[in-house]
Amino acid sequence: RDSSTSRGLGDVYKRQGYAPVENPEIRIGRNTKDFGNGFYCTIIKEQAQRWAKRYDTKIVSIYDVRLNSALQIKEFKEMTDEWLDFIIDCRSGKKHAYDIVIGAMADDQIYNYVSDYMDGSITREQFWVLAKFKYPTHQINFCTKEALKCLEYRGFEEVL
């Protein structure tokens, strides 16, 4: 291992179907994402499996991660106003300077509340009342090519 790695996250899972992803790459899509463009994974295996079940071929790719302390890493340890503002900025198309962003995911239901807040339909306080998760969520976005070097492909599992 490279001496510049500071901490490992252990296994992370790519929440997608179709086929294993041995060589991760930054995806730039039409739709804006919580933490901007990048390669999204999670440390919660069950979450990745739930996402994979949306596809005909239900595949979860598995990686080992060693974070490089030289990279710009932003971690949201909990859902806070800063987390919400960051998601709103990213979903609005604003760029950020981080290589890796880690934190809770605004799933479909939560994103509806984010949209309502952005539209002024609900207040920030109302957002937080509505934003209680049924189960915890987690995401890591590898935003740059340098960040992708922290990932080592270990294999995949088919979700039944």
Regions found by a protein language model. Give the residues of each.
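Conserved NAD+-utilizing ADP-ribose enzyme module
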Residues: 7, 21-23, 34, 54-160
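Generic detector of short alpha-helix boundary/capping microenvironments
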Residues: 1-2, 26, 36
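Short aromatic-glycine-(Arg/Gly/Cys) micro-motifs in beta-strand/loop hairpins
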Residues: 11-33
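Aromatic side chains
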Residues: 13-14, 35, 39-40, 63
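Extended catalytic/binding region for NAD+/ADP-ribose chemistry, centered on the ART fold
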Residues: 30-53
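Residues immediately flanking
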Residues: 16, 45, 65
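Single conserved hydrophobic/aromatic residue that forms the stacking wall/gate
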Residues: 1-13
